[in-house]
Amino acid sequence: VIVEVDEGQHRGYAEQCECARISEIVGAIGGKSVAFVRYNPDTVRYGGTVHSVTAAERIDLLVETVKSELGRVSSRFEVRLIQLWYDAPMAEAKREMDITMLVAV
């Protein structure tokens, strides 16, 4: 489990660069399954409207997510991306994606 703090949701980063960076990390850890937990400490908008979230709510979800990922057992190689407190069209504090096909070489 790799936790990243993404100030400003890293909006300025190109998706290709992010995939290349993640691919390098996966290769460096020996091709083992990994979950990237990305935590946005800044303002979050749902449907364009600012959503108020306390620091305690943010940390609670981060800790819960990390604990859950540490206990997760996978029967296959996978690379997962979990975004916490990112902008979204609807209220969604946590988004999970399997990005194995995007980053595995």
Tell me the role of every PLM-derived stretch.
Residues 19-33:
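Conserved short loop/helix modules at catalytic or binding sites
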Residues 30-105:
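Basic, glycine-rich
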